[in-house]
Structure formats: C-alpha cells, structure tokens
C-alpha cells in the first residue's frame, strides 16, 4: 500500500526544503500494446524505459528529444495522466505509484500542466473569466468575490488586459490563448508546472514572448518547471538542468551549461548540430 501523501501544511514545509523533490521518478517504464500482432502474441511498444528524473523546487528541468522519444509520456507519468508499467513515482518523498483519487486531487493542486495547443486545452464555449475561475470552483476555493479577485490577479501575471475577461478562446490570438492556459495552470498556486511543447503551436514571433513569460513567472513565483521541447536551443533558453531522451531512454542528463557545452552522448551532439532554433540563430 502507498504511503499517505503529506497534508497541505507538510507540503509547504517540504517544498521549502530545496533537497526534497516535488516529483521523483525511479526506474519508470511505460509499455503500450501495439495494434499489430495477434490476440495471443500481442506486440508491445516500450515508450519509456528505466527513466529516473526529479522535479526540484524552484528549478527548471528541460526534457528534449525528437517526436516519439517518450518525453511527453514521461511528463504524463509525473502529473498522473499516465500510469507507470514499472518503477516508482514519489510525491514529496512519498510513494504515490498507485495513485488514489485523493492522491490525484492533491498532486493536481501542487503540479499543473500547460499543454501544447491552447486551442484544445481551453473550452471554446467558456469565457476567459470562467476558464480561470473554474479550477477554483472545482476545488471549492474561496467565495465568488475572492475568485473574481484571483482571476484578475492571474490576468496581470500573464500580461493580459482586463478586457480579455469576457472573450472566448476563438476571439484571441494563439499567444493570448496560451497566456490564458498558463494563467489557468497558475490558478491554484501550484509549486510546479509541466509545460509540454508550450511554444510549438505558436508563430515564431510569439514564441520568445511566451518563453520570457515562463522565465519571469519562475523567478517571480519561485516555480519549479518541467519544460518539454524537441528544440534543444529553446530548452537551453529556460532550463537549469536538461535531460536528453532517445527511444524512451534518458541518454544524457546534467547541468544545462555543462551538457550543452560538453555533450557526451552522440545523440545530444546530433541535436546540437541540427538546424538552429529561430530564437537562437547562432550557437555559442
């Protein structure tokens, strides 16, 4: 049986300890049944193999790799959207591999997710006001008045005007929609955000703005973050540490500057030698 997760007061004290990971994966594997094969001899896809990772308080872990390398599946295990086939998942040092509904609710209030495409992450029929207030209502936080105040605070945090409150997602630009998605992720005062390709669906001119916003929020709020991208130069821009994934495995992990200036794995060198990001036309 999994250990009880910490109470809210315990969570706050543990998060203040820079040596206690918010989320930790130990030897995690995720296997899916493939559509090929037969009923009696099904084929399996090993999406994640033996992954070890930590989300540390106030730090940004970048996960980089090509499409299909397992980075998004790994992130889904971290936030509870995917169950690990093997291995262990820890939340504040407690084993939550077999998560109950209470586990998921509690972790969801501490770790939020920003998805790749804000157009699909937001309800097209809900105004920005309702999108941002909804998590507070679901978790029964505050009164209508305090929720309205929090919604306005969130707009300010992500640089949107109050005039956006009554807008529907379809009336906003891609960059504005992603700002709303980020604001929604911040609504419950999380201590960590998992950002899964948060700039890849945006125009090049908007990507730097969103990256700068995430970087500013990390500093202002003391957020931990997992930043996922196929572009190693974009990951470099925001990360303290970087994990490079290939074929479901972490092939290299380390301090961002050290890993990028002195890569030890051929796959990392391949990523660095690929076409440079438009955000960084020249490598150091």
What do these predicted regions represent?
Residues 189:
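Conserved catalytic motifs of ABC-family nucleotide-binding domains
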Residues 168-172, 176:
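Conserved ABC ATPase signature
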Residues 64-66:
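The feature captures the beta-strand-to-loop junction immediately N-terminal to the Walker
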Residues 79:
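Helix-to-loop junction immediately C-terminal to a conserved catalytic motif
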Residues 95, 146-163, 272-273:
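Conserved ABC ATPase "signature" region
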Residues 87-95, 107:
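Conserved ABC transporter NBD signature motif
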């Amino acid at each position: 049986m999994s250990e009880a997760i910490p109470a809210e007061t315990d969570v706050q004290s543990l998060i203040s300890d820079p040596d206690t990971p918010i989320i930790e994966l130990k030897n995690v594997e995720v296997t899916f049944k493939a559509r090929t094969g037969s009923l009696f001899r099904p084929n399996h896809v090993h999406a994640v193999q033996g992954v070890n990772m930590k989300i540390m308080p106030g730090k940004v872990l970048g996960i980089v790799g090509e499409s299909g390398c397992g980075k998004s599946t790994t992130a889904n295990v971290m936030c509870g959207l995917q169950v690990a086939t093997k291995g262990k998942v820890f939340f504040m040092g407690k084993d939550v591999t077999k998560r109950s509904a209470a586990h998921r609710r509690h972790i969801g209030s501490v770790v939020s997710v920003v998805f790749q495409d804000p157009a699909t992450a937001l309800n097209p029929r809900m105004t920005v006001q309702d999108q941002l207030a909804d998590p507070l209502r679901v978790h029964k936080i505050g009164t209508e008045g305090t929720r309205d105040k929090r919604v306005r605070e969130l707009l300010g945090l992500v640089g949107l005007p109050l005039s956006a409150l009554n807008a529907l997602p379809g009336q906003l630009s891609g960059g504005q929609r992603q700002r709303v998605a980020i604001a929604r992720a911040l609504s419950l005062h999380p201590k960590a955000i998992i950002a899964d390709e948060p700039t890849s669906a945006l125009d090049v001119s908007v990507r730097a703005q969103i990256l700068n916003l995430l970087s500013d929020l990390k500093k202002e709020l003391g957020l931990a973050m997992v930043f996922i991208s196929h572009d190693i130069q974009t990951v470099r821009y925001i990360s303290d540490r970087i994990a490079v994934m290939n074929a479901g495995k972490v092939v290299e992990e380390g301090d961002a500057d050290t890993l990028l200036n002195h890569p030890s794995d051929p796959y990392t060198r391949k990523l660095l030698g690929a076409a440079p990001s438009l955000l960084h036309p020249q490598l150091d």
